[in-house]
C-alpha cells in the first residue's frame, strides 16, 4: 500500500516459465495483490503458477490465448472486483522479466501525489539510457512516438513501453466492451485517455532486454497501428466538437486540419491556397504547415479538456 492507495500488479504471461518466477518473487513489499494471467501458454507456465496457490497476494487467471491486451484488461477488471470499494492503483508489469520492479515506486508516485491519473514508463529518459534496446526498436519507437504525439495531442516519447500505472478512477469509467485489444494497445490507451481528459505523466524506467525475440511483423504492425491511431485521433476531435467539451482550440485545430486536407486533395482549394500555390509554394508544404498549426491548437485543447474535467470533479465534491 502507498498513501491511501492499495497497489495491484497485472502480469500478463504467455510461455514465460523461464522468467515468471523471478518476476513474481521480486515484487516490492508494498504490492497488495498481483494478478497473473496465463494467456494460453503451451510451456510450463501454468504448472509454475501452481506453486503460488497458497500465497494470499498472488491471484491467477487462465485465458485461452486472447492476446496481451485482453489479458491486461482481464487483470484490471479482476482488481475492480477485488477492491470495488477501495482506492487503488493498477500497475501493468510484463511476465518476461524486462521490467525492473525497483522502478515501480517511481511509476506510482505521481498518482499517489495527485498529479495525474495515469503514468507511463519512459525508457528513453532513464539514467541508464536505451543502450540495451535493439536499433530497429529505437527507430520504431521514435516513429510511433511522433504518431502517438499527434494522435493524442500531448508529448509521448516512449509509447510502446508497457510498464504503466493506472488510477482506479480510470478503470471504473473505462468502456471494456470497446477497449482495443490488438497491436497498438498502449497507443490506444494514451489517445483515449486524452479524449476523456485524464492527466498523463511519465516516469523513467530501465530498459532491459534478454534473449527474447519478437514475433511481430513490422509492416502489418505499422499499418494496423497507424490506421487505428489516425481513426482514434479524428474520433477524439469530433467527439469534443459534438460535446460540451468544445473549446476554441478544438475549433481552430479543426479549421487548420481542414485547410491541410483541402490543400492536399485535388480539386479542393481556397483563395489563400491558390494564392500561395501561385507564388510557388507546394501544396504539400501548405498541408504540413496547416497540420503543424492544428497540432499546436490540438495540444491546447487537450490541456483545456483536462482542466474542464478537474473543474467538474471539484464542483461535484463541493
What are these regions (language model features)?
Residues 11, 32-41, 61-64:
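Short beta-strand/loop segment that forms part of the nucleotide-sugar
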Residues 18-22, 43-52:
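Acidic helix N-cap motif at the loop->helix transition within catalytic regions
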Residues 14-30:
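Short, well-formed alpha-helical segments that are part of the catalytic scaffolds
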Residues 6-8, 33, 188:
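Cell-envelope/extracellular polymer assembly enzymes that use nucleotide-activated donors
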Residues 1-3, 180, 184-318:
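Hydrophobic helical membrane-anchoring modules
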Residues 16-19, 41, 68, 100:
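Donor nucleotide-sugar binding loop of glycosyltransferases
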Residues 61-78, 89-92, 101-183, 209-220:
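Acceptor/aglycone-binding surface of glycosyltransferases and processive sugar-polymer synthases
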Residues 38-47, 97:
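A conserved acidic beta->alpha catalytic loop
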